[in-house]
A protein has these predicted regions:
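A structural motif corresponding to the C-terminal lobe/cap of the Radical SAM core domain
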Residues: 288, 299-480
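Cofactor-binding loop segments of dinucleotide-utilizing enzymes, especially the Rossmann-like FAD-
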Residues: 17, 46, 96, 282, ...
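Short acidic/polar active-site loop segments enriched in Thr and Asp
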Residues: 60, 111, 275, 332, ...
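Acidic, low-complexity intrinsically disordered segments
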Residues: 4-263, 267, 271
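Residues at alpha-helix caps and immediate loop-helix transition turns in enzyme cores, especially N-
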Residues: 26-27, 55, 74-78, 258, ...
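Conserved beta-strand positions
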Residues: 14, 64, 93, 279-281, ...
C-alpha cells in the first residue's frame, strides 16, 4: 500500500559561468527555492569546478545564470556542449542579461528566459514543465499509472510496472518502481520574462557549491589575506544611469532582501570560514534605512568580520553623515563607479554626479580614514587623449593610485541591447550595427590613438597582474604609455606617500566590455567545451576542467 501522493520531481542543474570571483548568489538563492519545492538540484560554478557530466546527462532542466556580459558570452560557448551531452533537457537562461539578449539566446536553443526577480518564476516554470501535480493517492501499487499533463498536444502516459528509461524522461522513485514521462518541448513561455514582484527571499542554499575559500579573497596590507563570503541585501536600482545594464530590466525599481535572511546567510558563511563579506548590491544605499539597520546588526553579531559595499558617488554625498556608520561597523572599503572625471561624459551617462562631487568624496574618505575604491569606464566614444591624461592626473592628485586596480584604467564602455545610451541622437553616428555574437553595439573612437592606448593599458594591466607588480608600478607604466601616445613628454610622476589598501583578489567590473584577459578566457572556455564533447563521444571524458 502507498499512503502518500506521488510527485514527479525535476532533476535541475543550475550553472554559473562568471560572477566576479564570488560564490554566485544568483545560483544559491534559486537553489533554495527549487529544493524547497522538492526538486533535485545540482549547482555548478564553472569558474571553480569541472562540468559534472553525470549531472549534465541526468538533467531534465538546465538553468544558466547570466548576471553580466562576460557570463553571457561564456554561456553561449557552453550551450552547444550541454546540447551535445544531453539534447533532451530543457534549457533556461535567467538573470539580468537573459531578457536583454532573449532573441540571441532563443536562437541558441534556449526555451525559457527569466529576468529581474526570477526565483518564483523559475519554480513556476519547473512545476509547469514537469506537470507537478499529485499523481497518486492510496490504493495498490499494481493499480498505479502515471498521468502527465499535455505538452505540445502530446499526452505521455507510462505504467510504473516495467517502464523503461529514455533520454529526456523524468522518473519518480516509488520503492523499486520508476515512472517515465517524456518532457519534450515546454511550449510557449507563460512565465514572466521580467518579473519585478516583491519576493519573500529564502535563506540561500549553498550546499554543493565549491568552498568559499576557493573564491576571491581579501588582500590586506602586509601581505595577509582573509577568506571572503558574499551576499546581497538588495537587487535592482532606483537610478537610471544610461550605460547601466540594470536599467533595461529594473527601470528604476529595487527590491530588498529581508534583514533576517541576509544575516542568516552571513552567519552560515562565517561558520564556513568567512572573515570578510562582500555585498553584491548594485547600490548599498538605495534603501538607506535598510542598509543602516543591517550593518548595525551585522556588527553586533559579527564584530570581528569586515565587509565591503558598492555605493554611488551621488549617494556618498547625499548620505555623507552616514559614512561614519560604515567605518564603525567594519566596512573596509567602498567601491564606487566614478566612470569619468569629464563632466560632459558624466552627463551623457546620466551618472548623477560631477567631477567635483568625486573629488569631494575622495577627500572626505581620506579625512575619515576610510578607503574608497573608484572604478572607471576610462574609454568611451567621447574620450580624448587629453581627457585620459586628465583622469590619470586626478588619480595622482587625489592620492588614489593604490586604490585603483590597473585594469580599471583600460575599461571600455559596453553598449548592450536595450542600453539607454541608444536614446542619445549622437549615438547613431558613433556605433555600428548590433553584433549578435559579441552582444554589443561596436564602437571605435574617432581618434585611433585612443583605442590603441586602451589596448596598451589592458596589456599592461594583464602583465602587471601576471607578474604581481605593484599598483604604483603598473600605474607608472600606464602614465608613460599614455603620454607617449599623446606625443608629449611624461612629467616626472610625483606620487604621494600613499598607503597600502585592502582589496579583493579579483577585480570588480561593471558596464564594461570584456578585457583582453577575459576574451582569452572565453576562447579557452569554448575550447574546453569542444574537447569535453569529443572525449565524451570517445567514451573517455573525465570532466570539464
Amino acid at each position: 500500500m502507498l499512503g502518500r501522493d506521488i510527485l514527479l520531481m525535476m532533476k535541475i542543474v543550475l550553472i554559473s559561468t562568471y560572477e566576479l570571483g564570488r560564490q554566485p548568489f544568483g545560483v544559491v538563492s534559486p537553489a533554495a527555492w527549487l529544493r524547497k519545492a522538492g526538486h533535485d538540484v545540482a549547482c555548478l560554478d564553472l569558474t571553480r569546478q569541472s562540468l559534472d557530466e553525470e549531472a549534465v546527462r541526468a538533467a531534465e532542466l538546465f538553468a544558466i545564470y547570466l548576471p553580466m556580459h562576460t557570463a553571457t558570452r561564456l554561456a553561449a560557448k557552453l550551450i552547444p556542449t550541454l546540447r551535445e551531452m544531453n539534447d533532451g533537457a530543457h534549457l533556461c537562461c535567467y538573470g539580468l542579461y537573459a531578457p536583454m539578449n532573449a532573441g540571441y539566446l532563443r536562437g541558441l536553443g534556449v526555451g525559457t528566459i527569466l529576468g529581474g526577480e526570477f526565483e518564483a518564476e523559475l519554480v513556476k516554470f519547473a512545476q509547469r514543465l514537469q506537470g507537478l501535480k499529485p499523481l497518486y493517492s492510496g490504493g495498490e501499487m499494481s493499480d498505479l499509472k502515471v498521468r502527465s499533463t499535455k505538452r505540445n498536444g502530446v499526452e505521455a502516459q507510462a505504467k510504473l510496472d516495467g517502464a523503461s528509461a529514455a533520454p529526456g524522461a523524468a522518473a519518480v522513485d516509488v520503492g523499486d518502481a520508476l515512472a517515465q514521462v517524456e518532457i519534450g518541448n515546454a511550449g510557449a513561455q507563460v512565465e514572466k520574462e521580467i518579473s519585478l514582484d516583491r519576493l519573500a527571499f529564502l535563506l540561500p542554499d549553498r550546499a554543493g557549491m565549491p568552498a568559499i575559500e576557493k573564491y576571491a579573497h581579501l588582500i590586506v596590507p602586509g601581505g595577509g589575506y582573509r577568506v571572503v563570503g558574499s551576499t546581497e541585501a538588495s537587487r535592482g536600482c532606483k537610478h537610471l544611469c544610461r550605460h547601466c545594464p540594470i536599467v533595461p530590466v529594473y527601470d528604476g525599481v529595487f527590491r530588498i532582501v529581508a534583514r533576517d535572511v541576509v544575516i542568516a546567510d552571513v552567519r552560515q558563511q562565517v561558520a564556513a570560514g568567512a572573515r570578510h563579506i562582500s555585498f553584491g548590491d548594485p547600490d548599498f544605499f538605495n534603501g538607506i534605512r535598510h542598509a543602516l539597520e543591517l550593518i548595525a546588526e551585522f556588527h553586533r553579531e559579527f564584530p570581528d568580520v569586515t565587509y565591503d559595499v558598492t555605493i554611488k558617488i551621488e549617494h556618498l554625498r547625499k548620505y555623507e553623515k552616514e559614512l561614519v556608520a560604515l567605518r564603525e561597523t567594519g566596512c573596509l572599503f567602498v567601491i564606487s563607479a566614478v566612470e569619468s572625471v569629464d563632466d560632459e561624459i558624466l552627463a551623457r551617462l546620466d551618472k548623477g554626479h560631477t567631477r567635483a562631487d568625486f573629488v569631494h568624496v575622495a577627500r572626505k574618505f581620506r579625512e575619515l580614514d576610510m578607503t574608497l575604491h573608484p572604478t572607471f569606464v576610462a574609454f568611451t566614444p567621447w574620450t580624448t587623449l587629453e581627457g585620459y591624461l586628465d583622469l590619470l592626473r586626478v588619480i595622482v592628485a587625489e592620492d588614489l593610485v593604490e586604490n585603483v586596480a590597473p585594469v580599471q584604467l583600460g575599461i571600455r564602455l559596453l553598449i548592450p541591447e536595450g542600453s539607454r545610451l541608444l536614446e542619445l541622437e549622437e549615438m547613431c553616428g558613433l556605433v555600428g550595427k548590433f553584433d549578435a555574437e559579441l552582444l554589443v553595439y561596436p564602437w571605435r573612437n574617432v581618434d585611433a590613438r585612443v583605442d590603441r592606448v586602451s589596448e596598451a593599458v589592458q596589456a599592461i594591466a594583464a602583465d602587471a597582474d601576471q607578474e604581481k607588480q605593484s599598483r604604483s608600478g603598473a600605474f607608472a607604466r600606464i602614465w608613460e604609455a599614455a603620454h607617449e601616445a599623446a606625443g608629449v613628454a611624461a612629467p616626472e610622476l610625483q606620487l604621494g606617500a600613499g598607503y597600502a589598501v585592502p582589496f579583493l583578489s579579483e577585480p570588480w567590473y561593471c558596464c564594461a566590455e570584456p578585457t583582453r584577459a577575459q576574451l582569452v578566457s572565453i576562447g579557452a572556455f569554448a575550447k574546453k567545451a569542444e574537447i569535453a564533447v569529443r572525449l565524451e563521444r570517445a567514451g573517455t571524458a573525465d570532466g570539464f576542467v
